[in-house]
Design a protein with these regions (language model features):
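Outer-membrane beta-barrel architecture
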Residues: 55-59, 94-96, 139-141, 178-182, ...
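Short glycine/proline- and aromatic-enriched beta-strand/turn motifs that initiate or cap beta-hairpins
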Residues: 21-81, 295
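Transmembrane beta-barrel strands of outer-membrane/channel proteins
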Residues: 32-38, 60, 69-73, 109-115, ...
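Detector for outer-membrane/organellar transmembrane beta-barrel domains
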Residues: 142-244
Length: 304
């Protein structure tokens, strides 16, 4: 889960009309929010009662500059005993500059830094060491008006990981992108179809840790009903391979993941907004048993 991507989307959506309406009056726009997410695989004890994922964020925008700060945490939790397994803390900083910002074309560039502070635990719940890994990011984004009804938009991120990779199992490099077309049917309904790619690889030829590849078609159908926006969506897997079990089995394993979800968003028209989201995913694996996956999230955001 990328906390800053979700929060940045809210800022950009709220900021486009504001920038156009007050192009000559520069001022600060702030945005603060929090989210709680859970993820769970049916019938497995490895993740206990599921993954516990709280996050908070803060964004500040001045003219073409946007500064973003976030703190995210992830790890399995057992709510009956209130105990946790291995988890990590993930503070993050990003700075975006908008080079072009018109209704016809928007182009921006983001640089970012993220730290992963891992806290390992053994099978008995006792502390079992730690790791401290960093991720550096550069990401262009764009939004192009093709016609009154069609737009082409997306982003492309390049990541470099450093330190303690042998402990965390990560590859040293990664690319991630989501890009596609939006068709605006009317003021209420639009349709978006995107291509998504995420790939982890190693620039160091002596390593094969944590390499993977994911390709998906992602489709969204936002329905705007006044202050309420409902967005049913799906993710259709095209190709998915991984070797996350790199310590015992470096061979790549194939997967087939497909997801259906619904995002509910409500704008209170006073700067406050909230989201509710649920998704169900079918996860089929070449090796081992297939899984059924549930995701749920609730978020609140205040813009001022």
């Amino acid at each position: 889960m990328s906390t800053l991507l979700k929060s940045a989307a809210l800022v950009l959506c709220a900021g486009v009309s504001c920038v156009q309406a007050t192009e000559t009056a520069k001022h600060w726009d702030f945005n603060i929010g929090a989210m709680y997410e859970i993820e769970n695989v049916e019938g497995q004890g490895d993740d206990k009662d599921g993954l516990y994922e709280p996050s908070v964020w803060f964004n500040a925008t001045w003219d073409a500059w946007t500064l973003s700060l976030a703190m995210y945490q992830e790890g399995p939790v057992d709510y009956s005993s209130m105990t946790r397994g291995t988890y990590f803390d993930r503070p993050e900083f990003e700075l975006r500059y908008r080079f072009i910002g018109t209704d016809d074309f928007t182009f921006g560039l983001t640089g970012g830094f993220r730290n992963y502070g891992y806290h390992f635990k053994d099978e008995h719940g006792a502390k079992d060491g730690s790791a401290n890994m960093q991720r550096y990011k550069i990401q262009p984004d764009w939004d192009l008006k093709l016609t009154d009804d069609w737009r082409f938009s997306g982003w492309f991120a390049m990541y470099q990981f450093a330190n303690d990779l042998e402990k965390t199992g990560y590859s040293d490099s990664r690319v991630e992108t989501e890009t596609g077309f939006t068709w605006i049917l009317n003021e209420t309904i639009s349709a978006k179809i995107n291509y998504y790619l995420e790939r982890g690889f190693n620039m160091d030829g002596s390593r094969n840790n944590g390499e993977f590849s994911t390709q998906e078609i992602r489709a969204y159908l936002p329905i705007s009903l006044g202050s309420t926006t409902l967005t049913p969506y799906t993710r259709l897997g095209l190709d998915r391979q991984s070797n996350w079990d790199w310590q015992d089995d470096p061979e790549r394993e194939g997967h087939d993941f497909n997801r259906l979800g619904l995002l509910y968003a409500y704008d209170f028209s006073n700067g406050l907004s909230m989201t509710l989201e649920y998704a169900y995913e079918w996860e089929n694996h070449d090796e081992g048993e297939n899984d059924r996956f549930h995701y749920a999230g609730v978020g609140v955001n205040y813009a001022f």
